[in-house]
Amino acid sequence: MKFVLLFGVLLVTLFSYSSAEMLDDFDQADEDELLSLIEKEEARAKECTPRFYDCSHDRHSCCRSELFKDVCTCFYPEGGDNEVCTCQQPKHLKYMEKAADKAKKFGGKIKKWFG
């Protein structure tokens, strides 16, 4: 039994040492890569399509609201043959955002009363 325990401790020690070395190598090698990805993400975020604007050129370019991303919704106007696409917020997400806002305000009041 002592041999199994000693072998287990040795195995855990070797595993933790090797994983720590791998993490150090990963952190040093990919730090610059991570910064470049963050810069690209910031640049991409500036190109979003505002709510109720045309999104037919890129249906995944709608901006985010407070909690959720808007959705590109396409429809045919009455009496027209051309498809129109605009960024819109689905009603269920709108209601969820309102409920979250009310919960935040109520939480602030509770904190004020008891804090």
Curated annotation (Swiss-Prot):
PROSITE patterns: SPIDER_CSTX. GO terms for molecular function: toxin activity. Keywords: Disulfide bond, Knottin, Secreted, Signal, Toxin. GO terms for cellular component: extracellular region. It holds the Pfam family Toxin_35. Disulfide bonds join 48-63, 55-72, 62-87, 74-85. The keyword Mitochondrion does not apply. Residues 21-44 form a propeptide. It comes from the Eukaryota. Expressed by the venom gland. Its main location: secreted. It is found in: Secreted. Residues 1-20 form the signal peptide. Belongs to the neurotoxin 19 (CSTX) family. 01 subfamily. The presence of a 'disulfide through disulfide knot' structurally defines this protein as a knottin. This is U3-lycotoxin-Ls1a.
